[in-house]
A protein has these predicted regions:
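Short linear motifs at protein or domain termini
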Residues: 1-95, 203-223, 228-245
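Conserved amphipathic alpha-helical segments that form helical-bundle/coiled-coil interaction surfaces
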Residues: 95, 99-157, 168-178, 186-196
Length: 245
């Protein structure tokens, strides 16, 4: 199987998981994905193995696999890692007065104006990748590359918020400006604030989702239990006192 074909399927699935098009708990099968991507099952199988290795898939009863659940602690860890990489990158980049391509900011604002979540995530990844490249240390980008699938997923949760994306690109622009001006401490402070706020908002949104999901599940369970109890009543009790009389 051509490696680029496996990588294309893998990248498409990472993007779908990151944007929420494939949500936690969704079941996917090799056959379904092969039809969707118009490829044989072999590249799909290899891509699924990579996703399982990355912790994005888990076993499912019966056929196929499930998109792994999102856990607040896991996303905190992802943002701790990204925060450390960003802090080092902006320090090195600002020391060199590196210039971040302004079209990256424009692309992000454009995706925001179109409310296009996949493009917003792509633009965010592109901006942070540019920061890592501007640092002059190729190992920063390499380290981030090992975790992009989780970082994209974390971004998907954060950028899904109603108000979160409105200030993301203002913060990115301010970071790029401080880096270009050689203001190392200001660039670091802006980057740390950006990462911390994103992490806190992301975890809060995820916890709200979990509470809503648990509430809906509990309501459904209560309803099913009530219906089961009602079915177990004697016919006279189910009809009510007036009907039974």
């Amino acid at each position: 199987v051509a490696p680029d074909l496996v990588e294309q399927v893998y990248a498409a699935l990472v993007k779908a998981i990151g944007s929420g098009a494939l949500a936690p708990g969704d079941r996917v099968t090799q056959e379904q994905l092969a039809r969707q991507f118009k490829v044989s099952r072999q590249p799909v199988l290899q891509a699924l193995r990579l996703l399982r290795r990355d912790g994005l898939l888990c076993d499912a009863p019966g056929r196929g696999v499930l998109i792994a659940p999102l856990e607040a602690n896991s996303l905190r860890w992802v943002y701790q890692l990204r925060g450390a990489l960003d802090d080092l990158a902006v320090s090195l980049a600002a020391a060199q007065r590196a210039r971040i391509d302004p079209t990256l900011i424009r692309d992000g604002r454009d995706a925001l104006a179109r409310s296009n979540l996949p493009d917003l995530i792509d633009a965010d990844v592109a901006f942070h990748s540019a920061l890592y490249q501007a640092s002059g240390n190729p190992m920063i980008l390499e380290a981030a590359g090992r975790h992009w699938s989780h970082i994209r997923r974390a971004m998907g949760v954060f950028l899904h918020g109603e108000h979160a994306p409105r200030i993301v690109w203002d913060e990115h622009a301010a970071i790029a400006e401080a880096v270009a001006a050689g203001e190392v401490e200001r660039a670091r402070q802006l980057s740390q604030t950006h990462t911390h706020r994103a992490s806190e908002a992301m975890v809060a949104q995820l916890e709200v989702r979990h509470r809503c999901a648990h509430g809906a599940a509990a309501e459904a369970l209560d309803r099913s239990q009530t219906e089961a109890l009602d079915r177990s009543k004697p016919e006279a009790l189910r009809r009510g006192p007036s009907e039974a009389a």
